[in-house]
A protein has these predicted regions:
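Short, small-residue-biased leader/transition segments that mark boundaries at the very start
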Residues: 1-6, 24
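Compositionally biased, low-complexity intrinsically disordered regions
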Residues: 6, 15-17
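Residue-level detector of intrinsically disordered terminal segments
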Residues: 10, 29-30
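Short hydrophobic alpha-helical segments enriched in small aliphatic residues
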Residues: 13-15, 25
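Anion-binding alpha/beta catalytic cores of soluble intermediary-metabolism enzymes, centered on
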Residues: 30-296, 301-364
Length: 364
C-alpha cells in the first residue's frame, strides 16, 4: 500500500506544483530554491536556538519548522509563558525543547564559562548571572558555544549589533577567517542573470566602509557561501561606479586594490573587477565594456564597495524586482549564528533557520 500512497502523493505534489507554476511563476521559483535548502537541512538535522520567544513570529516559525522537520529547536524563555503565548497564537510548539535560564541545570556552567571567557574584561560571576538570566541572546550563544546547540537565529526584535555582539565576544571568528561579514541571498524571479536569478550580495549588512584587505576577505567568504547555498560555481564581481578604469577616483582605487588582493589570495576563484553592475551581470554589456574578462556579464556574487551601496542594492532588488532577500546571513563566525531583519515574517525565519542548518552541516 505504501507504493500506492507514495505515487498518489507524487501525483498530488505534481498537480499542485503545476498549479503553482501556472498561477504564480515567481513563488514557484522562490519556493523551489528555498525548498532545496530545506531538504538539505532535513538530510542531517541540526539543533537551532531561537531566543526571541516573546515575539509571535518566532513561535509561528517554530510551529512550521517542527511540522516540516527542518531542525530541532530550542526555545529560550519561561516555559509557562512561552506555552501560553503559543497557545494564544494557535501554534503547536510541543516538539521544541524550552529552556528557562532561571531553572535550567546548565545555567551555572554557562555562568562559569562566560566569566572565564570575559575575564580580561573584568566580568564577575554576578554580572555573568545577570546577563544570562535576562539577555536570552547571550544564553542562546552560550548554548552554541558549549555544544548544546549547533546554531542560533535571532534579530526579529533586536538590532544586528545586539545580535552579533555576543557572538563576537563568545564564539569569535572561524579559524582562517580575518573578518566577520554579512551577505544577502537574493532570488530574483524570471531573471536570466546570475544563477537563474540567484545571487549573493556582500557585504550588505555589517561592515560600514571596508578597506581593500577587508573587501578582498568579504569577496572570498561570499564566494564560499554562494557555493554552499546555491551549489554552483561562484563568479565574483567587485562592483564600483567604474568599469576597468572608466572613472578615476579614490573610491575606485580601493576596489581596484581589493580586486588585486582577492585574486592573489584566491587564484582559483573566478573573480574580477572593477565593474559597474551592468558590466558584471549583462553578457552584452560585459563583452563591450570589459572584453576578455572571465567574469564580465556572468557574475553571481556581487561585492559592493561599502555598506551604503550594499544595503541600497539589496533593497532595490527586493522592492523593485520583487526579489526574495534572505539575510543578513553572517559568514566568518566560528559557529553559525544568523541575524534577521526586524521586518521579517515567520516564513523568513523558517528560511533563515534552514540556511543556518546547512551552514552547520558544512562545519561537520
Amino acid at each position: 500500500s505504501s507504493d500506492v500512497c507514495s505515487s498518489d502523493l507524487e501525483m498530488d505534489t505534481y498537480a499542485s506544483s503545476q498549479r503553482i507554476t501556472v498561477t504564480n511563476e515567481r513563488s514557484h521559483l522562490i519556493m523551489g530554491f528555498i525548498d532545496v535548502i530545506k531538504e538539505r537541512a532535513k538530510s542531517s538535522i541540526k539543533t537551532i536556538v531561537l531566543p526571541e520567544t516573546e515575539d509571535m513570529r518566532t513561535l509561528e516559525a517554530a510551529d512550521k519548522i517542527l511540522k516540516e522537520g527542518i531542525a530541532k529547536l530550542v526555545l529560550v524563555g519561561n516555559e509557562e509563558a512561552v506555552k501560553k503565548s503559543a497557545a494564544e497564537g494557535g501554534f503547536d510548539i510541543s516538539g521544541a525543547q524550552i529552556v528557562d535560564p532561571a531553572t535550567s541545570e546548565k545555567t551555572q556552567g554557562y555562568i562559569d564559562k562566560l566569566v572565564e571567557l570575559r575575564q580580561k574584561k573584568g566580568m564577575t560571576p554576578e554580572q555573568a548571572k545577570e546577563i544570562l538570566l535576562n539577555q536570552y541572546l547571550y544564553y542562546g550563544v552560550m548554548m552554541v558555544k558549549m555544544g548544546d546547540a549547533d546554531g542560533m537565529v535571532s534579530g526579529a526584535c533586536h538590532s544586528t549589533a545586539d545580535t552579533l555582539r555576543p557572538c563576537l565576544q563568545i564564539l569569535k571568528t572561524k579559524p582562517g577567517t580575518k573578518l566577520v561579514s554579512a551577505f544577502f541571498l537574493i532570488i530574483v524571479p524570471d531573471c536570466e542573470y546570475g544563477a537563474n536569478g540567484a545571487f549573493v550580495f556582500g557585504d550588505s549588512g555589517l561592515n560600514q566602509n571596508p578597506n581593500p584587505e577587508e573587501l578582498a576577505a568579504i569577496a572570498a567568504s561570499s564566494a564560499e557561501s554562494f557555493k554552499l547555498l546555491v551549489q554552483e560555481e561562484p563568479v565574483v564581481a567587485m562592483l564600483s561606479h567604474s568599469t576597468k578604469g572608466s572613472a578615476k577616483h579614490a573610491d575606485v582605487d580601493k576596489v581596484v586594490e581589493a580586486t588585486k588582493i582577492a585574486k592573489e589570495q584566491n587564484p582559483d576563484l573566478a573573480l574580477d573587477g572593477e565593474f559597474q553592475l551592468d558590466a558584471a551581470i549583462v553578457p552584452s554589456v560585459g563583452a563591450s565594456k570589459a572584453p576578455g574578462s572571465p567574469v564580465a556579464g556572468k557574475a553571481n556574487v556581487l561585492i559592493f564597495p561599502d555598506l551604503d551601496a550594499g544595503n541600497i542594492g539589496y533593497k532595490l532588488a527586493q522592492r523593485l524586482a520583487k526579489a526574495e532577500a534572505y539575510g543578513p546571513i553572517t559568514q566568518g563566525i566560528a559557529k553559525p549564528v544568523n541575524d534577521l531583519s526586524r521586518g521579517c515574517s515567520a516564513d523568513d525565519i523558517v528560511g533563515v533557520v534552514a540556511i543556518t542548518s546547512v551552514q552547520c552541516q558544512a562545519q561537520d
